[in-house]
């Protein structure tokens, strides 16, 4: 059974009785709380974008308040630790899932949807997943490969120095090396078989 088979396709007419759907760390009660909380948010604001515009003066303030809102409302509907996991604290952590969502919504190119028109790409901070952290650590941008807010700011500052108008532009390209090719962002035996080695700045010009 799919998500839409279970809950329906209309956020205002949900079928939430007896759901057994779960996702990774989210138990059925967490999934149910997530759907109900989003439905309530749509009823109050009309869209997630409108909620952001109402919840803060800028996208960062809105993100912080959005997380507080979703955590509080979700807890009232039975959401547990799995639910809270979806809404990482953007003040203390990189909050990669939330920032990936913002990248999709705000940036507009062949990779990202860009359906939110009230924010600019220059407002976005970077997304620090495992691959970006490995790249940044091996490149000397950060001192440890941990997903902290401090490291998020340092990585964003690095890419913003390259492109102040769109610092998150490089996330897809850099992380894709790790996702698709297993890149370690440094000289490694994998470089010997990588099809991108000749154009890669991290390979150290490995000869195959």
Predicted features by range, described:
Residues 1-208:
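HhH-family (HhH-GPD) DNA N-glycosylase catalytic core used in base-excision repair
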């Amino acid at each position: 059974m799919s998500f839409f088979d279970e809950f329906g396709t209309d956020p205002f007419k949900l079928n939430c009785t007896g759901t057994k759907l779960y996702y990774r760390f989210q138990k059925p009660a967490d999934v149910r709380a997530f759907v109900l909380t989003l439905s309530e948010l749509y009823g109050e604001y009309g869209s997630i974008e409108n909620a952001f515009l109402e919840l803060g003066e800028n996208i960062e303030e809105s993100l912080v308040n959005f997380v507080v809102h979703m955590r509080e409302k979700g807890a009232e509907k039975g959401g547990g630790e799995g639910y809270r996991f979806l809404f990482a604290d953007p003040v203390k952590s990189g909050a990669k899932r939330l920032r990936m969502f913002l990248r999709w919504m705000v940036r507009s190119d062949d990779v990202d949807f860009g359906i939110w028109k009230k924010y600019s790409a220059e407002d976005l901070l970077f997304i620090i997943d495992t691959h970006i952290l490995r790249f940044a650590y091996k490149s000397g941008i950060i001192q440890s490969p941990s997903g902290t807010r401090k490291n998020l700011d340092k990585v964003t500052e690095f890419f913003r120095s390259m492109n102040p108008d769109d610092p998150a532009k490089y996330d897809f390209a850099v992380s894709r090396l790790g996702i698709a090719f297993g890149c370690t962002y440094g000289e490694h035996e994998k470089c010997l078989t990588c099809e991108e080695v000749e154009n890669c700045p991290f390979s150290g010009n490995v000869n195959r």
